[in-house]
């Protein structure tokens, strides 16, 4: 099997069928309590994919080879799920802010949900435009319920393929599984947001120059298999397992060879999310 080198999404450091019922009724009050998001609006929603590959020389950040594979894979996956996909390439930090501000001002009243995918270099709490960093909190804040009223009560998903630090996970041999205490970034508790990070806080995120990033490969694969069968958090758990068990870095630099990765999901969703209805 041909090996191609893995890279990290950080600044350069050196050169049987089960039926699922989507609601329940309180036996005491007789009030219908819907446990899943309403996904039968006229439109599924927008999926914005920001794919930053080439960076200004002043940033000192290398090109992100393999990211175009991710962008194409995501476009196909979410188009098949009936989302209106908009791909944007090589945006500056100012352009990213302006784009998401503009999208948040659109009328989403006929849309079931919103998805934003960020493919770039990053650090903890930061994503990079082609000319420098921007706070993730600033970008997600445009879609808060008090700012984007037409998405209030609807699921807002942010999928982030980027490094969150410079730690490397060497992995551990096990025959029974391990339990790690992973403390995620403190995020404001606005309801109905979900953040799917490619890696745990403080760690590198790996990307293959030929096949794309481990996380996006796995996410698209699991969505293709299970989007019409499983709830989204269950799908993401399978993504976590796939990344954790099926990938290991290959690098000509011994310090970066044989490393592992685990995605991190931060959910403030208040209902179950199914991509079918």
Curated annotation (Swiss-Prot):
Propeptide residues according to the Swiss-Prot or TrEMBL record: 1-9, 10-28
Positions of modified residues (S-nitrosocysteine): 163
Modification note: Cleavage by granzyme B, caspase-6, caspase-8 and caspase-10 generates the two active subunits. Additional processing of the propeptides is likely due to the autocatalytic activity of the activated protease. Active heterodimers between the small subunit of caspase-7 protease and the large subunit of caspase-3 also occur and vice versa. S-nitrosylated on its catalytic site cysteine in unstimulated cell lines and denitrosylated upon activation of the Fas apoptotic pathway, associated with an increase in intracellular caspase activity. Fas therefore activates caspase-3 not only by inducing the cleavage of the caspase zymogen to its active subunits, but also by stimulating the denitrosylation of its active site thiol.
Domain of life per record: Eukaryota
Activity control: Inhibited by BIRC6; following inhibition of BIRC6-caspase binding by DIABLO/SMAC, BIRC6 is subjected to caspase cleavage, leading to an increase in active caspases.
Primary site of residence: cytoplasm
Record-annotated active site: 121, 163
The UniProt record lists the keyword Protein biosynthesis: no
Family stated for the protein in its record: Belongs to the peptidase C14A family.
Cross-referenced PANTHER family: CASPASE (PTHR10454), CASPASE-3 (PTHR10454:SF198)
Function: Involved in the activation cascade of caspases responsible for apoptosis execution. At the onset of apoptosis, it proteolytically cleaves poly(ADP-ribose) polymerase PARP1 at a '216-Asp-|-Gly-217' bond. Cleaves and activates sterol regulatory element binding proteins (SREBPs) between the basic helix-loop-helix leucine zipper domain and the membrane attachment domain. Cleaves and activates caspase-6, -7 and -9 (CASP6, CASP7 and CASP9, respectively). Cleaves and inactivates interleukin-18 (IL18). Triggers cell adhesion in sympathetic neurons through RET cleavage.
Protein name: Caspase-3
